[in-house]
Amino acid sequence: MSRKGHIKKRDVQPDPIYNSKLVTKTINTIMEDGKKGKAQTIFYQALKQVKTITNRDPIEVFHEALNNIMPVLEVRTRRVGGQNYQVPSEVRPERRHSLGLRWLVKYTKERNEKTMEERLAKEIVDASLGNGVSVKKREETHRMAEANKAFAHYRW
């Protein structure tokens, strides 16, 4: 246990174009090796492509996609009496966002389109429509939680 008390969470500055903290967090998730400018370019270009594909507000489509990706339940391993149980538990809102963004970026990188902008745009559009690999990951996580519902009483 720490004796110094709780550590304050650093507040993220909203991005200059859409004035959204969620966009900044997404850009930070995309960023590799501290190259934030490149990550911003990728994200903003992807949103432009989303606008051309869907003819809708790209931020609205992005929020819709993220809502379809964010998990509500997950399983956590709990050791009881020498056995490991997969115990379903609810996901905190903050972790929901970070998991959703992480999965979005991870499965975007695994797509086959030529540029990262294209991949991200297509994954956002697919996720907003309810298909796409990142949405499948969420459904798989929920299936695991549902299958292990019997161990819910081990929750802590």
From Swiss-Prot:
GO terms for molecular function: rRNA binding; structural constituent of ribosome; tRNA binding. InterPro entries: Ribosomal_uS7, Ribosomal_uS7_bac/org-type, Ribosomal_uS7_CS, Ribosomal_uS7_dom, Ribosomal_uS7_dom_sf. One of its GO terms (cellular component) is small ribosomal subunit. The keyword RNA-binding applies. It holds the Pfam family Ribosomal_S7. Keywords: Ribonucleoprotein, Ribosomal protein, RNA-binding, rRNA-binding, tRNA-binding. One of its GO terms (biological process) is translation. PROSITE patterns: RIBOSOMAL_S7. One of the primary rRNA binding proteins, it binds directly to 16S rRNA where it nucleates assembly of the head domain of the 30S subunit. Is located at the subunit interface close to the decoding center, probably blocks exit of the E-site tRNA. NCBIfam families: rpsG_bact. Belongs to the universal ribosomal protein uS7 family. Part of the 30S ribosomal subunit. Contacts proteins S9 and S11. This is Small ribosomal subunit protein uS7. It comes from Aster yellows witches'-broom phytoplasma (strain AYWB).
